[in-house]
Amino acid sequence: MAGRSLGKAVATVSLSVALASVTVRSSGCRAIPAPRNPFPSCGFHLKANIMSGSNGVKDNSHNKARTSPYPGSKVERSKVPNEKVGWLVEWQDYNPVEYTAVSVLAGPQWADPQISESSFSPRFNEKDGHVERKSQNGLYEIENGRPRNPAGRTGLVGRGLLGRWGPNHAADPIITRWKRDESGNKITHPVSGKCILQFVAIKRKDCGEWAIPGGMVDPGEKISATLKREFGEEALNSLQKSSAEKREIEEKLHALFSQEHLVIYKGYVDDPRNTDNAWMETEAVNYHDETGETMDNLTLEAGDDAGKVKWVDISDQLKLYASHSQFIKLVAEKRDAHWSEDCAADSHGL
């Protein structure tokens, strides 16, 4: 579980956003007063960060990957100004700090050895045994035997808290349902007139911020299996259940995770754990319980890396871990659900 604990994913929007073509319409909703922000004090609200290519970024991107101190340490990154982020920009004086966490250097199962070890010969940009070293964003460059972050400089080399050289793959399941009144009717927002969508949110133990459940893809594991496993562990506390309870949870989740779904995003993640040589990538997938019956038969219970779990109304007032709010906005748009009281903002999207 250590690898999963260290690898909880955050994400922003890049050119590799993958959106399904389906737009789900809703009707028959009842209006209620506008909901208040359920998370007034946690997280931060990010703008969309769009990668402009494998060797350069726009001015408003690649921000979290340059923040100091590095998570879980007192290590300060070398400062990288916006105009020097891209690798195509010559910077002879660039002198990044070297840092790899002790927990990674200890050689757990989820971590690679050091590049300098003679017995370690990773096959970058391809499937390396059970380890996926291909990037969702295409080929990445190798410099002096080390992968180079496709989004640009971060001010730090090594792996930090990340186990793999190059891409570290994660998955984020976004489970949604319509908000309903006591009679079972869908509820609309009084200003936008659109039905209110809800999603399952967890409160992370490591930073106390609310987020989408999710975690690292285990070696050899399919993304679909990771999505279901992580939701069960964090939102249903499946790790602490009896064998019979686990089977029951598995059967109910199978019904939800087997239906049609929307791939909201996949690709590079602007994450504070990223370095010049190791970075996060994720696939965020929306599973929607249209009638609400499947999730009504499952009791939410925080587990694993989650301190709390609950259903949350979706709107632009949400402040979530990293840029999870961007994923949630995309879900609201694809489901034609309420997002903002500002109609113009709704129509412009990202």
UniProtKB/Swiss-Prot annotation:
Amino acid composition bias (Basic and acidic residues), ranges on this chain: 124-135
Region described as Disordered: spans on this chain: 53-77, 116-153
A GO CC annotation given for this chain: cytosol
Subcellular location: Mitochondrion
Record SUPFAM superfamilies: Nudix
EC numbers for this chain: 3.6.1.13
Pfam annotation, one family: NUDIX
Nudix hydrolase domain span: 178-334
Source organism superkingdom: Eukaryota
Enzyme class, UniProt record, top EC level: hydrolase
Main location: mitochondrion
Full protein name: ADP-ribose pyrophosphatase, mitochondrial
Source organism per UniProt: Rattus norvegicus
Name of the gene this protein is made from: Nudt9
